[in-house]
Amino acid sequence: MDSEKILNAVKEARTLAKPRNFTQSVDLIVNLKELDLSRPENRLKEQIVLPSGRGKDVAIAVIAKGDLAAQAEDMGLTVIRQEELEELGKNKKTAKKIANAHGFFIAQADMMPLVGKSLGPVLGPRGKMPQPVPANANLAPLVARFQKTVAINTRDKALFQVYIGTESMSDDELAANAEAILNVVSKKYEKGLYHVKNAFTKLTMGAAAPIEK
């Protein structure tokens, strides 16, 4: 899709949303076509680094113990220790709240079997299974990358809606993020963007603005 048409859709989305007393998010909505999504190879499951960043921090939880847990605490991240992890396995309601409140999860590699048992049934369907790291990992580079990343997981649905930033970002920044996501879609399929039926940009409380093909 043409960069200028993506930019025009971002600008139109702003005009379709009334001012609110909070900073609205901006999403890209994409409808796919002519894909057999019962076949796993046709599904989109991607983590995409946004060239303009997210515009606001995303909550990250670290499942760890010892030095890695201490490092995560010093960084102001949510820390889930082994005893808490075991409790979450028994309390699905609390586990769901934690899953919904965090964009990404990181787990100490030797805790992954327990993570799979305790949180796997909650995180798996949400496409949020943790990134495993060794006990002596430096979390800073991974956290920095996640703060610029969005995740797409279509499963068997021919539609996805993904965050591309906030209304406080410039039109050019938002358009660059939307284009980066559409480029991933284009590279995924042999026929590229032919498989995009239509695409829109939208603010939280606004109507969707179509991206002209």
Swiss-Prot record:
CDD domains per the UniProt record, alphabetical: Ribosomal_L1
Question: GO cellular-component terms in the record?
Answer: large ribosomal subunit
Q: Annotated Gene Ontology MF terms?
A: rRNA binding; structural constituent of ribosome; tRNA binding
Q: Which Gene3D superfamilies match?
A: 3.30.190.20, 3.40.50.790
Q: Provide the alphabetized UniProt keywords.
A: Repressor, Ribonucleoprotein, Ribosomal protein, RNA-binding, rRNA-binding, Translation regulation, tRNA-binding
Report the SUPFAM superfamilies cross-referenced here.
Ribosomal protein L1
Q: Please, which domain of life does this record's source organism belong to?
A: Archaea
Q: What does this protein do?
A: Binds directly to 23S rRNA. Probably involved in E site tRNA release. Protein L1 is also a translational repressor protein, it controls the translation of its operon by binding to its mRNA.
Partners and quaternary state? Answer: Part of the 50S ribosomal subunit.
> Which protein is depicted?
Large ribosomal subunit protein uL1
Species annotation: Methanococcus maripaludis (strain DSM 14266 / JCM 13030 / NBRC 101832 / S2 / LL)
